[in-house]
UniProtKB/Swiss-Prot annotation:
Source species taxonomy: Viruses, Duplodnaviria, Heunggongvirae, Peploviricota, Herviviricetes
Pfam family, one: UL16
Cleaved signal peptide residues: 1-21
Organism annotation: Human cytomegalovirus (strain Merlin) (HHV-5)
Subunit composition and interactions: Interacts with host ULBP1, ULBP2 and MICB.
Protein known as: Protein UL16
Membrane spanning stretches: 185-205
Amino acid sequence: MERRRGTVPLGWVFFVLCLSASSPCAVDLGSKSSNSTCRLNVTELASIHPGETWTLHGMCISICYYENVTEDEIIGVAFTWQHNESVVDLWLYQNDTVIRNFSDITTNILQDGLKMRTVPVTKLYTSRMVTNLTVGRYDCLRCENGTMKIIERLYVRLGSLYPRPPGSGLAKHPSVSADEELSATLARDIVLVSAITLFFFLLALRIPQRLCQRLRIRLPHRYQRLRTED
């Protein structure tokens, strides 16, 4: 990834300062919002015990699932680099549109990579490769009662660099959504039902019985002919 140079957005500086502060700090997210102001309490970013996702090299990243998202509701993803807590990327969405991007100055992890799907549930995800630059903590954010809260926390690590916990195995690939898994299950069920239906249809035509009768008739004659030839 290229190093980005230029002026530093004031909002980004304020956000980074908030991360290092011990007192509660809030970021105003309401300037482009049609609803009431939603505030991000930065101290909450470290208040949830992390979960772990172990993965090999491949397509992976934080995937956030949301149900019953209204048009004016704010959701988002915050990324914290595994090797440096000060490297943070934050994207916020409202009504399928990016409303705020506190992008890291040197490494924009989520830029041109964060995507959104709304069928059947709202999903924020990216298809970036898992590299040393994209491993870290991903927090799924949602505005609740005027405060941006973490509803899910995900750690992504390279399986080749970190030992897996005993018996943990690899987690389900995060790019597999609920609707995609449902489609695969539905296709399997259709094939199974079709096979059963075809079997009973052939059974109704007495084709299996006729086939068995022909085999029973032919086999004794063939066996008798072989004995005669001997």
